[in-house]
Amino acid sequence: MQGIGGMTDSLPFDFDPDLYLRLNPDVAQAGVDPVTHYQCFGRQEGRLYLANASTRSGIAMLASEAVSALEIGPFCNPVLIGENVSYFDVLTRADLIKRANEIGYDIKHAPHIDFVSPNGDLSIVDRKFDAVLSSHCIEHQPDFIRHLNDVANLLNEGGAYFLIIPDKRYCFDAGIEVSSIAEVVAAHIEGRKVHSLTSAIEHFALTTHNDPPRHWEGNSFDDTYENAVLSRIKLAVQAWEGGKGGYIDVHAWQFTPTTFREMITRLCKLNYIGLVAEEVHETALGSNEFTAILRKPKQHSVITA
């Protein structure tokens, strides 16, 4: 095969044409031969041809290979699709579609929601799974530790929690400090079920634009950012007080790959959680998210803390 510049490009020994198309849906949609595409373009473009957990598509593929999988919070655009997949959300499918229509989201992939809890209570799920996946979900949990333990209790021994997590450096959380072990433990000891005023102020007043390339270029703040902070803080307090103790959807936690791994490691050593960090991948250039796999070791006992 003649590649670009007339060079002969041999295929990697472990190249799988079908997997290449699954990892690169734009190639599949174009109807291009996967072997030809990889040899002429894919290699130079750094296209994935093996499933690994460092990307959204890769971690989805690994999770979908489990005998049974649960996706938390799919909304109308699930990461996992298949007969082996169940879904948990705070709204029914009908309500998700209604909400999606209100905000202009595509509804063609809206899944049937197998488990519905308006307050996000995972304990209503009456089955165990080999894999659980969530995308941009864990940062919304008022009690980070409780969430991890609830997931662990849904996993079979040896099962894994697959996560797609925003990297605070490259999303609208760029102006907020990374979360500390003190904050995470305090939220758990308090039994926090709704977000704190601190989280509300951070989310409504201190967030910035959500353009990853600009963040990667070091341009995280608009010229009007500083001048707007004070007025936004007042509005944040009003929104929190107006909630009258109810749930307001904001980010409670901010991580980078390094601080997330450190957090999980510390919580394990403190015996607050029973999941261990098996893989935590760096954020890809130009992206605003990273991936992680937390494993439930065999002989793991149920944690209720």
Where would I find each of the regions flagged by the language model?
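Short, charged/polar micro-motifs that form catalytic or ligand-binding hotspots
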Residues: 10, 131-142, 249-254, 281
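Short, charged/polar, Gly/Pro-enriched secondary-structure boundary elements
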Residues: 44-48, 299-304
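Active-site donor-binding segments of glycosyltransferases and PAPS-dependent sulfotransferases
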Residues: 51-67
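S-adenosyl-L-methionine-dependent methyltransferase catalytic module, highlighting the catalytic core
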Residues: 107-121, 146, 150-156, 160-300
